[in-house]
């Protein structure tokens, strides 16, 4: 959950957070990623100076304990990595078994993987092939950080490249172009499968030219992607009227799951069966028949994306008052949702009453104490 929150605060729109094993990820998304970063669990020898209690952990679970875990993670990461892609493997240990030895055995199993040259910061050291039996000279391209030579603790990292054509069509790119998966069936979104309505194609996928779009209405009169309508309900359509033409999303991008409006980062077909923590951008929620934009949406926008907005300076006391959840006053006479920005950067929402009073809508869990 902490990772999902950090991505929300960063305004990330195209990220998916799962709680899955590397093996299941590789089974679901083979050769899907162009970049893979492994922060491998390790014996932690490089952390002894900062946290002496790590010595007890090392005595209980030394390098021999972590080697099979790291081997399995590397194997699944290889399966996840697309041809022409790059992978970083890193640890916080000095152990050659977990560092150069791990990479040497991985390269022996996968001759299509090679070590890349990287630019070293001052004080960074090269890998130590002489520390293992049969170590290849290419292991010197690895990076070691020793606390007596560089600012920091003890670390190891290596950049690996997978041979192949990065532009080679894979199943996912074909699905993006045609809207049809490898099984010949049309790719649907989560809401299609749950019956709550959805987009016809992936939000960020390329739209194939000349393909007829299906009717935007269901037989029962519901709009796709927006679910049931109720008379007098404030729907997202009214909110979209305040979006400028520069906004990176439209009403058609929305799908709905129960009372939550989403912009999915991936088709649910692609991640079906995975334990999901976060599947994309939470656009907003239906609160007692009224649409409320999310805090994540505000942070994912630029100030020019929304017409009704105010821009405070960092020195303005109202910026702090807003972060504390207080009502603020301004010369903004708009009614409805107002985007609150500080020095040009969106921070969250208020709701105007048309007389300059802005009711605070900053997420309660994020407010300053």
Role assignments for model-derived ranges:
Residues 100-123:
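Conserved Class I S-adenosyl-L-methionine
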Residues 163-369:
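Polybasic, low-complexity RNA-engagement segments
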Residues 141-170, 174:
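Core SAM-dependent methyltransferase catalytic element
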Residues 32-34, 111:
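Local beta-strand N-terminus motif with an aromatic residue
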Residues 1-30:
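S-adenosyl-L-methionine
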Residues 81-83:
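Helix-to-beta-strand junctions that scaffold the AdoMet/dcAdoMet cofactor pocket
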Residues 86-90:
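Conserved beta-strand signature within the Rossmann-like core of class I S-adenosyl-L-methionine
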Residues 34-75, 92-99:
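Mobile active-site "lid"/loop adjacent to the S-adenosyl-L-methionine
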């Amino acid at each position: 959950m902490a990772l999902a929150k950090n991505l929300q605060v960063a305004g990330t729109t195209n990220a998916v957070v799962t709680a899955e094993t590397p093996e299941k990820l590789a089974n679901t998304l083979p050769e899907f990623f162009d970049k893979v970063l492994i922060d491998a669990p390790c014996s932690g020898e490089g952390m002894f100076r900062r946290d002496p209690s790590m010595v007890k952990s090392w005595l209980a679970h030394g390098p021999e304990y972590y080697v099979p875990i790291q081997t399995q993670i590397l194997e699944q990461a290889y399966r996840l990595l697309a041809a022409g892609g790059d992978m970083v493997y890193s640890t916080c240990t000095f152990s050659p078994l977990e560092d150069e030895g791990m990479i040497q055995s991985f390269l022996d199993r996968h001759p299509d993987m090679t070590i890349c040259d990287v630019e070293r910061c001052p004080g960074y050291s090269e890998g130590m092939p002489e520390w293992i039996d049969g170590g290849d000279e290419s292991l010197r391209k690895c990076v070691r950080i020793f606390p007596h030579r560089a600012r920091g603790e003890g670390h190891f990292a290596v950049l690996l490249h997978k041979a192949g054509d990065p532009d080679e069509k894979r199943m996912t790119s074909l699905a993006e172009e045609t809207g049809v998966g490898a099984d010949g069936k049309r790719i649907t979104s989560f809401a299609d499968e749950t019956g709550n309505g959805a987009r016809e194609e992936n939000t960020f996928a390329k739209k194939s030219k000349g393909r007829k779009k299906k009717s935007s209405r269901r037989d029962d009169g519901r709009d796709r992607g927006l679910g049931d309508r109720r008379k007098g309900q404030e729907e997202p359509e009214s909110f979209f009227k305040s979006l400028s033409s520069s906004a990176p999303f439209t009403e058609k991008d929305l799908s709905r799951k129960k009372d939550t409006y989403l912009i999915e980062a991936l088709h649910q077909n692609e991640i079906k069966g995975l334990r999901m923590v976060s599947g994309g951008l939470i656009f907003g929620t239906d609160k007692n028949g009224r649409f409320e934009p999310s805090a994540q949406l505000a942070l994912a926008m630029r100030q020019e994306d929304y017409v009704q907005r105010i821009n405070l300076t960092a020195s303005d006391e109202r910026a702090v008052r807003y972060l504390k959840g207080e009502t603020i006053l301004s010369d903004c006479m708009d009614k409805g949702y107002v985007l609150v920005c500080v020095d040009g950067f969106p921070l969250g929402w208020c709701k105007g009453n048309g007389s300059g009073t802005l009711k605070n809508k900053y997420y309660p869990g994020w407010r300053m104490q």
